[in-house]
Every structure is written in C-alpha cells, then in structure tokens.
Amino acid sequence: MTPMPRFAILRHETPPGSPRPLHWDLLLEDAGTLLTWALAESPAAGRPIAADALANHRTAYLDYEGPVSGNRGSVTRWDAGTFQWRRRSDREIAVILRGDVLCGEAVLTRADDTTPRWQFVVRPEA
C-alpha cells in the first residue's frame, strides 16, 4: 500500500531587508519533490490567504527546522501531517489535510494560468 503523501507548513522568518517578509511555507509532497507556496499570513480555518507559488523544494524540508541557506532566515514547523488529493488542475488544487493543527479541505485557486498568485483557504471539518 502506498503511504499517504505528507505536507508541512513552516513559519519562515526572514532577515531584515529581505524582499519577502515573514511568511508561512506550504509544502505538499508530490513525486519526490515539494510543491511550495508562500502564505502571506498564518493559516486559519475559513480565512482566505494570499499565496505565491514558489519553486519546488526538497523533501528534506518536511522534517527540517533551522537556518535556511543563503542567509534567507530560518524556518520552524507550524503544522505537519498527511494529505489526500481531491482535485488538481492548473487553476485549482484541493486536498484533505490531516495535520496536528489543520484538518479539513484545503483549496488553492488562481484567477488564470499566467500568475504565480494563488488564494489558499482551509474549510474545517464539520
């Protein structure tokens, strides 16, 4: 049986003067890499959050806490667990999260295929 894919949300503190301020990195395991978005705010169920698509990250970040290379700050785990794919297209990704903090359907949507800007929302379980 194939294990459930893993996810993590890392609180990413950046150094002063960094082009991207404090944010939360959403990491979804996919075929040996991590699909990654920078969330503008701390995730909270039911609240839409701006999310910028980033380059895929190494799977080591699922378990990593500490300094980020290149003087890019440091990360601490905010949440982690497993997830199940629900829907996946160029404009929408929906997963069921089973984390220590977040449980429910998480949906990433974007207006068109040309922008890296997405919107992230978690719909809590009833």
Please give the residue ranges for each predicted region:
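A charge-rich, low-complexity, intrinsically flexible signal that marks solvent-exposed coils, linkers
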Residues: M1-A126
